[in-house]
Amino acid sequence: MNPIVINGTVLCDNITGIPRYVYENVVRLDKLIEGTGLDVRIAYRDDGRPIHLPELKNIRLVPLKSIPYFYNLAVLPAYLRRTHAFYVGLASDMLLTRRSVVVLHDIRPLVLDTDKGFFRFKFWVHCLSTKWFAQRVFTVSDNQRHLISEKLGIPERVIEAAQQHLSAEDKRLDAVLGQLD
């Protein structure tokens, strides 16, 4: 089976907000996949900052040398192609691969007039990459699901409002893992 690669670069940041979401899901996923034989990896931009994770038993860390911005545009996509990996973006990540799912937490920077300049442009490009490449999009609420569909033109059938965690009782995990075979 091809590897599943999660972008873990946000785990080098302070663990609040979206990095906390990624951290909690990775720690839970490490326990959930025990004994399944799945090859799950956390790829992250190795720029000298430590990655904030406990010791993982079933998920492998893959540091990739890169400069900022070049990581998501070239280094990570090249690694995904080289390893024939399925990509999981848990942090509203920019992606340049079709074999992927992404969590787009919200699109507030595109809807509200509070964010300006480069950040807003960068976020818009990230959202467009989601529209063009992601097979499935997950978000935090039904309201965000409708907003993402309306503002980005992504069909609602590929967007799912999902709980903010995985649990052993969550049967959707079995469905997702079944699609990877």
Where would I find each of the regions flagged by the language model?
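Carbohydrate transferase catalytic cores enriched for Leloir-type hexosyltransferases
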Residues: M1-D181
